[in-house]
UniProtKB/Swiss-Prot annotation:
BP GO annotations: ERAD pathway
Organism: Coprinopsis cinerea (strain Okayama-7 / 130 / ATCC MYA-4618 / FGSC 9003)
Keywords carried by this UniProt record: Signal
UniProt entry tagged with the keyword Signal: yes
Protein name per UniProt: Long chronological lifespan protein 2
The family this protein is said to belong to: Belongs to the LCL2 family.
Function: Probable component of the endoplasmic reticulum-associated degradation (ERAD) pathway.
């Protein structure tokens, strides 16, 4: 077989393999497509949240309607909800942290003491 025939066979097989396994799509354009899907998900969330009747605060993880953000439940039932008081706020505002693998918030409290 001549060199040009081998090159022709090689490029033909490579073209078939690339088409079959979407090599070029994943290698050159896969990230752009993935980012576009994330924007679509965010717009779907926005559209869904506008249709949920809630006059207070709509929890993003559970879509529960609560009085204030600190009242949101954790998305998973096995999580423990820990409240971290906001130091800058005069009222009882807090940041919610959901912890998995324990039965209480002692680890979060230890980390808070270390950070202050």
């Amino acid at each position: 077989m001549s060199r040009s025939s081998l090159l022709l066979v090689f490029f033909t097989l490579f073209g078939l393999a690339a088409a079959q396994f979407q090599f070029f799509n994943d290698f050159f354009g896969g990230q752009q497509h993935h980012q576009q899907q994330q924007r679509t998900g965010a717009s779907q969330y926005a559209a869904f949240s506008e249709n949920v009747p809630c006059s207070h605060y709509l929890c993003p993880g559970t879509m529960d309607c609560v009085e204030r953000p600190r009242d949101c439940p954790c998305p998973d039932v096995q999580d423990v909800k820990c409240l971290i008081p906001d130091m800058d706020s005069d009222d009882d505002e807090a940041t919610v942290v959901c912890v998995r693998g324990g039965t209480d918030c002692s680890t979060v409290e230890k980390l808070m003491k270390r950070g202050s």
